[in-house]
Regions:
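Structured catalytic cores of large enzymes
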Residues: 1-75, 86-90, 107-219
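A conserved hydrophobic secondary-structure block that centers on an alpha-helix together
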Residues: 78-81, 96-99, 113-116
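Well-ordered, non-transmembrane segments within structured domains
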Residues: 82-96
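A generic structural motif
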Residues: 94-107
């Protein structure tokens, strides 16, 4: 019934015929019932309640406090990251927050690995400080990085992802510029670009706004 999309009838047999009116270009798609793709269910489908945006600026008493230092870590390194955070709280007088990558992805990129999610959290903390002089100053990427995001190589160390870039001038004459050993590069400066319109990391861009470092730990 062409007037009722909820009413349909399966057609069986080797041949199928139908009539159409001429006068307009139309597209028809035939689908083999044996060739359907079914969505895969995530192994860890349950999502724990969290609210990074609502808690990142809260101290233990629930009062607002500006953040000086952000540490991003995978869950299996969180104890070591907290040890480092406590060192700087005690000896450097810094307000430090440790956030796991999984929680960042869950809140800023629908649960999927995305370097933009990490940068967007930094940007949220940066622009929501109580005053410009109280903005976050340091970011620590607590984990090794790899050029292989998809973990296809053996003994891969893609723990905290890194920005991949290439020279756009080279891409005009080279379709493989993104994998060129000459024009492609990796950089953590991406996570410190806080101004609107920044983040492309082309051949010319403004300086970073935050000190960004990485500890190449894997165990």
């Amino acid at each position: 019934d062409i007037y009722n999309v909820a009413k349909y009838e399966n057609i069986f047999g080797a041949n199928f015929n139908f009539k159409i009116n001429l006068g307009a270009v139309k597209k028809y798609v035939a689908v083999d019932a044996n060739d359907f793709y079914f969505p895969l269910k995530e192994a860890a489908a349950a999502v724990v309640n969290q609210n990074i945006k609502g808690t990142i600026f809260k101290d233990l008493s629930g009062n607002f406090e500006d953040v000086d230092y952000l540490i991003f870590t995978p869950p299996f390194l969180i104890n070591q990251a907290e040890t480092l955070a406590n060192f700087h709280r005690t000896n450097s007088g810094l307000t430090v927050r440790v956030v796991t990558l999984e929680n960042i992805y869950q809140e800023f990129s629908s649960g999927k690995q995305d370097i933009a999610a990490i940068r967007n959290l930094v940007k949220y903390v940066y622009w929501n400080a109580s005053s410009p002089d109280k903005r976050v100053k340091y970011v620590n990427l607590f984990g090794d990085a790899s050029y292989d995001y998809k973990k296809r190589i053996t003994n891969n160390n893609n723990i905290v992802p890194v920005f991949h870039g290439f020279d756009p001038a080279d891409s005009e004459n080279n379709n493989n510029a993104n994998i060129s050993l000459y024009s492609s590069f990796m950089s953590d400066d991406f996570f410190g670009l806080m101004d609107d319109g920044e983040g492309t990391m082309t051949g010319s861009f403004d300086g970073i706004d935050i000190a960004v470092g990485r500890m190449l730990v894997s165990t």
